[in-house]
């Protein structure tokens, strides 16, 4: 608009384009004055700015560089981003803590419920176990409670066992006492001692079973007497010396395994003289009575030969 006003004012009044209304011609000088007034003001403002610049240069101060402004902007942006991230992390931690707390409270509630249920059911089970003679046992009314019992057994075993063990400890202790009394009773210990071969007596049929003589063992008087009572069995054969020698040679080959050893022929002599008393004799030793019986059943003694059973303390 200012340019239009200047163009209108610069055209002369006698030119064809300059013929205008009287109202416009009267207004033109005011606009020119305004335009002329604005130009010296701008010049004065520019001069003042130049003077301030020269004054600053005189003191030796320099204007701040433009590179520091974006750094402040970057710092502000970083601080804003940090504040945002910290606020976000704080909010996330608060949310996670709230979720953990809610879960822990729910778990505690469920545990408390399971404890109360396990205690009530453990008391019922102990009351059922207390009566062993009772044939009828109550069962759960609904299948849902039966399945829930099985699912909760794993959680309530460790806690329910303590109270069940306290309630049923008296029965278990009584059973243990009965077992201990049965195992450590004097009758059972006597039976075991009676059955042991060390404390057995020697029956008449067992006399003569042992082959070797009793050595110098530190088994005591009783053990020594019992060992001496078991003497090896023997058969004493009486007859002519030649017949006994022939019988011995045949029996060694024919009846192997049915005897232990044969002795040479001998004869008894009286104490006052050197004369032989009776016929010559021979001993046949055995390891046990059964062996002697088997030998006696299998052997055929020659004519004119007599025999008799006996036992010796040692051979």
Curated annotation (Swiss-Prot):
Residues spanning the membrane: none
Purpose: Plays a role in limiting the replication of viral DNA in keratinocytes. Recruits the host NCoR/SMRT complex to viral replication foci to mediate repression of both viral replication and transcription.
UniProt biased composition (Polar residues): 41-52
Basic and acidic residues bias (residue ranges): 188-198
Keywords from the UniProt entry: Host nucleus
Cystine bridges: none
UniProt source species: Human papillomavirus 47
Compositionally skewed regions (Low complexity) per UniProt: 20-38, 84-106, 119-148
Family: Belongs to the papillomaviridae E8^E2C protein family.
Name of the protein in question: Protein E8^E2C
């Amino acid at each position: 608009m200012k340019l239009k006003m200047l163009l209108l004012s610069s055209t002369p009044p006698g030119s064809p384009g300059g013929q205008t209304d009287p109202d416009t011609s009267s207004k033109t000088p005011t606009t020119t004055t305004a335009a002329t007034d604005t130009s010296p003001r701008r010049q004065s403002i520019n001069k003042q700015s130049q003077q301030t610049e020269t004054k600053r240069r005189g003191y030796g101060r320099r204007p701040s560089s433009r590179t520091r402004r974006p750094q402040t902007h970057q710092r502000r942006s970083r601080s804003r981003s940090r504040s945002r991230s910290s606020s976000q992390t704080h909010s996330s931690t608060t949310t996670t803590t709230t979720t953990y707390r809610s879960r822990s409270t729910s778990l505690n509630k469920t545990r408390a419920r399971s404890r109360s249920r396990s205690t009530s059911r453990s008391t019922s089970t102990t009351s059922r176990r207390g009566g062993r003679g009772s044939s009828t046992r109550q069962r759960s009314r609904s299948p849902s409670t039966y399945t829930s019992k099985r699912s909760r057994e794993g959680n309530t075993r460790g806690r329910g066992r303590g109270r069940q063990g306290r309630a049923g400890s008296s029965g278990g202790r009584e059973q243990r006492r009965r077992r201990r009394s049965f195992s450590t009773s004097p009758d059972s210990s006597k039976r075991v001692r009676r059955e042991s071969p060390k404390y057995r007596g020697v029956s008449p049929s067992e006399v003569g079973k042992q082959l070797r003589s009793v050595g110098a063992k530190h088994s005591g008087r009783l053990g020594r007497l019992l060992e001496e009572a078991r003497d090896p069995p023997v058969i004493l054969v009486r007859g002519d010396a030649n017949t006994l020698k022939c019988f011995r040679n045949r029996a060694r080959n024919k009846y192997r395994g049915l005897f232990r050893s044969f002795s040479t022929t001998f004869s008894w002599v009286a104490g006052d003289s050197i004369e032989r008393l009776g016929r010559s004799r021979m001993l046949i030793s055995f390891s046990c009575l059964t062996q002697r019986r088997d030998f006696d059943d299998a052997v055929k003694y020659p004519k004119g030969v007599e025999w008799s059973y006996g036992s010796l303390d040692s051979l």
